[in-house]
């Protein structure tokens, strides 16, 4: 995949359901609906609303505690399962060969689904917590993911919060190359070099918290406000466009229908190379995730 100065320009993105192709040929809508920190009592309605708005790519995780509600929201929407792309994630306490297999089935049961379109390892096991066992634990977990992929329970397998060195280490023993890596990407925490490295490894990068997340000052940033005014767009739409033009797949989250709709409306303008550089140079606007090499949960 080749990227020019403005980012991923070889594909014409028309709307949130323009398809990207993973390295195994599976197609994925270019924008997803995120459900991080969406409570169980809100998630059902929010997911149904998101599907009504037009989202076909839904992202959840076991640790979010809302898979059952997400599943009900999908059922409430009443559309064909094949029209949806559903992702969930394996939580850290379930790493390991047998526990990974059980965790997938538990997620499927909670969601009320027969298969997942994408299943991710939520975080890499690290040496700080597991010492020399970290590499073995990641390899065993991935072996279970590969087997479940071969069994047809998952259409694509990938990673979350893995940095390039984690991916390279995993690939030393992997039979199947990961298709996706979902990491924190937003103005103020751009991960520019990491994105380029992951893309060079033929992974599709997804962006969680593309609008900055809880406690971030991204949406109040003066530079972003000026760029947004120039394009007659909101700061959120500028952030999503900036992510998209890097060839990265954004996962915006809102439980409000008006904002869900706003987060789909960023396909009718393009950021200039200078604007892309300005945004990528922003720093210290709020980071959500701890260093994956330092976490101990």
Residue spans of the language-model regions?
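A short, structured active-site edge motif that brings together acidic residues
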Residues: 81-94, 118-124, 184-185
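Acidic-and-aromatic substrate-binding clefts and catalytic sites of carbohydrate-active enzymes
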Residues: 38-41, 59-69, 93-98, 127, ...
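CE4/NodB-like, metal-dependent polysaccharide N-deacetylase domain
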Residues: 100-121, 147-151
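N-terminal binding-site loop/beta-alpha segment at the start of enzyme catalytic domains
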Residues: 2-84, 144, 211-212, 295-296
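Short catalytic-loop micro-motif centered on adjacent basic/acidic residues
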Residues: 56-64, 87, 155-158, 180-183
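Short, acidic/polar
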Residues: 38-50, 96-111, 165-168, 190
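Acidic (Asp/Glu)-rich catalytic clusters
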Residues: 23, 71-81, 108-114, 171-174, ...
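Beta/alpha (TIM)-barrel catalytic core signal, keyed to glycine-rich beta->alpha loops juxtaposed to Asp/Glu
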Residues: 125-297
